[in-house]
Amino acid sequence: YEADWKNYYAGVYRCNELISREETIEWKETDSKRGTYMGECRTIRALLYFDMVRLWGNIPLFDEPVNENRPQAEPSEIFALIFDDLQYAIDNIPADAYPKANASSNDGHITRYAAEALFARAYLYYTGYYGTEPAGVTRAQALAAVEDIIAAGEYSLVSEYKNLWPAASAGVAEIGDMETLYGTYAGDGNSETVLAMKFTSSQDYNGNNDGNRWQVMVGMRSLDAAPYGRGWGGLTVNPAFVSEFKSGDTRRSASIIDLVGEGISSLPDFQNSYNDQREYT
């Protein structure tokens, strides 16, 4: 986790740099967006710390851009900053900053509703894991956050669970036939998306660039065709998990790649290279 540790704190440092310079920035015509930009920055910092405190527990806390070693802080101190940052975002990002109607093009941005969702999620985690309320934050605040999201009327479940993913939305489709696969896909920024983390497709096998490393780790070996992409073939599905799905449960085919049922195991590349993969991946 050394690389993750460094990358997380590099992100925190960048956020701290911007936050520390807020009063010296010549906002001019962008002054109306000042709260939005700073709210997004502070939400990113909160999200970074939320990940780190769950990964490592006691960690050094930096809320300013300094080059020094600091002792570990208690999780309660980390969460105090998390909630403070998210509350700032809730108070300063206008509800119409990034309209849901334009989500397909701006769904990497952080909205007020994304900050509210993270606020409620952090509250649930803290009370569930530590068995007490975080100092200065109440259940009423967390409830108000999610109720505001609901009241906005911009979010809802998609009609079919499988449509959340291109590969699952069309059922068994010709490998590489993206027109069919995207035919029923709910799309980027769909009605279920409150906060989207954007990735590029430029990741390589050495961990470089900014792509989705998760895909590199778990993607099927030897297959380059969309929608699966090539990977290391890790995290194959436990058969016991597969058997938990009852007959006719459509969530199974939406969640698990069936190498035989989807025709993957009969592809020449698969037969010639890695035909020892498990039935489900």
Predicted regions mapped to residue ranges:
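Amphipathic alpha-helical protein-interaction segments enriched in hydrophobic
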Residues: 107-118
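Elongated scaffold/linker segments in the mid-to-C-terminal portions of large proteins
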Residues: 1-7, 67, 157-281
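Conserved, well-structured interaction surfaces
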Residues: 1-56, 66-80, 86-101, 281
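Structural register within alpha-helical repeat arrays
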Residues: 38, 45, 119-121, 126
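Proline-centered turn/helix-capping motifs that create local helix->coil transitions or kinks
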Residues: 52-60, 154-159, 203
